[in-house]
Regions:
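N-terminal non-cleavable signal-anchor helices
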Residues: 7-8, 22, 53, 64
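Surface-exposed molecular-recognition determinants
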Residues: 38-211
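Low-complexity, small-hydrophobic/phenylalanine-enriched stretches
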Residues: 11-40
Length: 211
């Protein structure tokens, strides 16, 4: 195969979005056809720093740790189109102080809450892990009241015995979401039970954009 018709306006886009052009995947780079923005996934943020740990009693905290990370979780204004997606990949360690411990996880773009879910956990001892993966699809762009973002997420946890449970999250924001002003992507966690033995430890977080 040959690389005959690669078009590189993406580098200009990368400067605006703080993305790594070398990290493009999910596209047919080796095709003889010109590359378009369709289905190009570009990493905007990758956590390389220390784990982010949130304990019971800490309040609502962000699992994005921009210190030492690659890229940025800042989304510049007017850099998306109808049909664009944001993708989230996150995993880490989770422990509870007994059964029926609850926490709230929220995904935000600027001031808009794209998803909010209360998760109820069983007794999870040392060695239990979680994954929080999914995407945000932009149905419409523009000002608040016009723009529409829909989230499709899966939060799963696996206990020390290898048993896995899933929460599927499907929510829409068509009131406060907008694409015409700069917005920071955040994912926050807050334990409802304030016992510090409840631990949510984010080990890895990737935030990507699909054009």
């Amino acid at each position: 195969m040959s690389i005959n018709h690669i078009i590189y306006p993406l580098e200009e886009q990368s400067e605006r979005l703080n993305i790594d052009v070398c990290d493009i995947h999910a596209c047919n780079i080796y095709s003889d056809n010109p590359i378009t923005y369709d289905n190009i996934e570009a990493r905007a943020y990758e956590q390389l720093s220390d784990d982010v740990e949130i304990n019971g009693g800490d309040g609502e905290l962000n699992i994005f740790n921009t210190t030492g990370a690659i890229g940025s979780n800042l989304i510049p204004a007017n850099t998306v189109r109808k049909g664009s997606k944001y993708k989230v990949y996150s995993h880490g360690r989770i422990e509870t102080n007994g059964a029926n411990q609850m926490f709230i996880i929220k995904t935000k773009l600027g001031n808009a809450i794209i998803e909010e879910k209360t998760i109820t956990l069983p007794n999870l001892n040392n060695g239990s892990i979680y994954q929080f993966n999914g995407e945000i699809l932009l149905y419409e762009i523009g000002n608040a009241g016009i723009a529409i973002a829909k989230s499709f997420f899966n939060f799963s946890f696996t206990d020390q015995q290898g048993l896995t449970e899933n929460y599927f999250i499907d929510q829409t924001n068509n009131t406060t979401f907008q694409t015409t002003a700069d917005a920071v992507a955040d994912i926050t966690v807050e334990w409802i039970d304030t016992n510090p033995a409840n631990i949510f430890n984010c080990h890895s977080l990737t935030f990507s954009k699909i054009y």
